[in-house]
């Protein structure tokens, strides 16, 4: 039998509605809606304008990515490029590639795919065409704490973490520290960067290498009649690590004009050797590539790009089925991650930074038409630059000085040439300082024009891979 409902008098009273709180909430929501509409009204045109601008850059970069993808497919010896977006892509080696390189630090075999940001890469390397890559006195003078902090990082066995005794640090650096840049952007039209790979013995590149305006070599790689038909005889620049710098006398034997660039540090023992040599010797001033190829070869490309229009690269080939790291003049040895380097070099070729010459391409007639043209690269660089500026909220100022963080000015008579009073008579009587005292009007016309376009300003990297931090030094013109 159904139970009758309780009388109304026995039901609990309905809860009181928080009318005041509810009304306040509605009022607040209404105000926020009005504020949002007003904000949208005033910001929508600016946002739309920015989106339109960004979309233009995205379209330009997407088209460039397609060109890079096609270039990798044609020139990559099996490598393929998968586009992620307008800036990012992945380079992949084919399945079955022999990945035998074991990273003992992180406990894994070398991977077969590598992620790259093309926008970041093209900004970095195109900027290098305007850079100075030799450490100078003007850089240390202009950079904040240049002598106290940075100079100490370039001297081994200093006994302190900073140059508290500047006089001592100047004594240790003076033998290889020019006052101003001894080399200039656009100084050479064509340059060859010659590595040490055993693949060089498979093709006779010697005459082709020697035909370049300047040749860059690494560490202790020999240049003699035995290997002349493979690697040539021309010797202009040599980039060495500190260990090889200790043996620079036998390395440089036979060429008093070959310029030696020490990649990392100097110290008393190296300085003692320099004082006996007739060769120009300097310290490298560059960047740290954490996601690119490793080793002295990559630094040689950086060095060459700061002086040369076209860079041809020999002796860095890695066959996809490599089994060991080989050198043309000695037994196989431990080296750097070959596949990572091979992938990055291929990316650089398809960005117009280098041209790779390989025994695996020897039977081909070299045709560079599948590499993006300089005009395409300039367009992509401008798009990447503007996009980066908008993303970081910076101004649209274009030009080579937009990333200058520190400015300085030096007069025409600034600073001494490199050297010390206790150098040997061999060095004092040599022509080691010829690049430092080279008359401006003897430079290649393109180098002179670039200098004028830059307003006599030299650009230096400040720290690591940061694209936005440059030390910029303006050289005042002589009144005569």
UniProtKB/Swiss-Prot annotation:
Topological type in the membrane: Single-pass type II membrane protein
EC number: 2.4.-.-
GO BP: pollen germination; pollen tube growth; protein glycosylation
A GO term for molecular function: sialyltransferase activity
Intracellular or extracellular location(s): Golgi apparatus membrane
GO CC terms in record: Golgi membrane; Golgi trans cisterna
Alphabetical list of InterPro entries matching this protein: Glyco_trans_29, GT29-like_sf, SIA1/STLP5
Coiled coil: none
Sequence ranges on the Lumenal membrane side: 39-480
Broad EC category: transferase
Residues that carry a glycan: 98, 130, 165, 321
Pfam families the UniProt entry points to: Glyco_transf_29
Cytoplasmic side: 1-17
Position of the signal peptide: none
Membrane-crossing residue ranges in chain numbering: 18-38
Keywords associated with the record: Glycoprotein, Glycosyltransferase, Golgi apparatus, Membrane, Signal-anchor, Transferase, Transmembrane, Transmembrane helix
Family (UniProt): Belongs to the glycosyltransferase 29 family.
Stated role: May possess sialyltransferase-like activity in vitro.
PANTHER family for this protein: SIALYLTRANSFERASE-LIKE PROTEIN 1 (PTHR47486:SF1)
Name this polypeptide is given: Sialyltransferase-like protein 5
Organism: Oryza sativa subsp. japonica (Rice)
Gene giving rise to this polypeptide: STLP5
């Amino acid at each position: 039998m159904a139970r009758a409902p309780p009388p109304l008098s026995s039901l609990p009273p309905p809860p009181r509605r928080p009318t005041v709180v509810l009304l306040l909430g509605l009022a607040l929501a209404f105000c926020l809606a009005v504020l949002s509409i007003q904000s949208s009204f005033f910001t929508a045109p600016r946002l739309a304008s920015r989106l339109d601008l960004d979309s233009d850059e995205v379209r330009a970069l997407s088209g460039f990515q397609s060109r890079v993808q096609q270039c990798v497919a044609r020139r990559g010896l099996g490598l393929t490029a998968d586009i992620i977006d307008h800036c990012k892509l992945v380079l992949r080696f084919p399945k079955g590639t022999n990945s035998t390189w074991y990273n003992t630090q992180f406990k894994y075999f070398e991977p077969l795919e590598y992620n790259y940001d093309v926008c970041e890469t093209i900004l970095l390397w195109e900027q290098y065409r305007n850079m100075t890559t030799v450490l100078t006195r003007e850089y240390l003078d202009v950079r904040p704490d240049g002598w106290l902090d940075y100079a100490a990082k370039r001297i081994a066995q200093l006994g302190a973490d900073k140059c508290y005794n500047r006089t001592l640090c100047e004594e240790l650096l003076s033998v290889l520290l020019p006052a101003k840049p001894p080399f200039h952007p656009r100084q050479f039209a064509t340059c060859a960067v010659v590595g040490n790979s055993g693949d060089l013995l498979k093709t006779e590149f010697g005459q082709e290498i020697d035909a370049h305006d300047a040749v860059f070599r690494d560490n202790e790689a020999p240049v003699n009649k035995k290997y002349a038909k493979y690697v040539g005889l021309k010797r202009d620049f040599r980039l060495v690590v500190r260990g090889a710098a200790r043996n620079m006398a036998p390395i440089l034997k036979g060429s008093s004009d070959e310029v030696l660039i020490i990649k990392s540090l100097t110290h008393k023992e190296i300085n003692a050797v320099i004082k006996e040599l007739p060769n120009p010797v300097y310290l490298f001033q560059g960047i740290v590539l954490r996601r690119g190829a490793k080793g002295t070869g990559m630094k040689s490309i950086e060095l060459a790009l700061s002086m040369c229009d076209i860079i041809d690269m020999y002796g860095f080939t890695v066959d996809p089925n490599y089994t060991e790291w080989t050198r043309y003049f000695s037994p196989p040895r431990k080296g750097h991650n070959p596949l990572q380097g091979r992938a990055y070099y291929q990316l650089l070729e398809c960005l117009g930074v280098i041209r790779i010459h390989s025994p695996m391409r020897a039977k081909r007639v070299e045709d560079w038409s599948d590499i993006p043209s300089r005009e395409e690269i300039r367009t992509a660089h401008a798009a990447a630059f503007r996009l980066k500026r908008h993303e970081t909220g910076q101004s649209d100022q274009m030009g080579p000085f937009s990333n200058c963080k520190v400015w300085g000015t030096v007069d025409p008579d600034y600073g001494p040439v490199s050297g010390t009073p206790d150098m040997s008579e061999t060095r004092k009587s040599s022509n080691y300082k010829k690049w430092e005292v080279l008359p401006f009007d003897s430079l290649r016309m393109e180098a002179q024009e670039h200098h004028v376009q830059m307003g006599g300003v030299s650009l230096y990297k400040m720290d690591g891979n940061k694209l936005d931090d440059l030390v910029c030094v303006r050289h005042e013109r002589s009144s005569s």
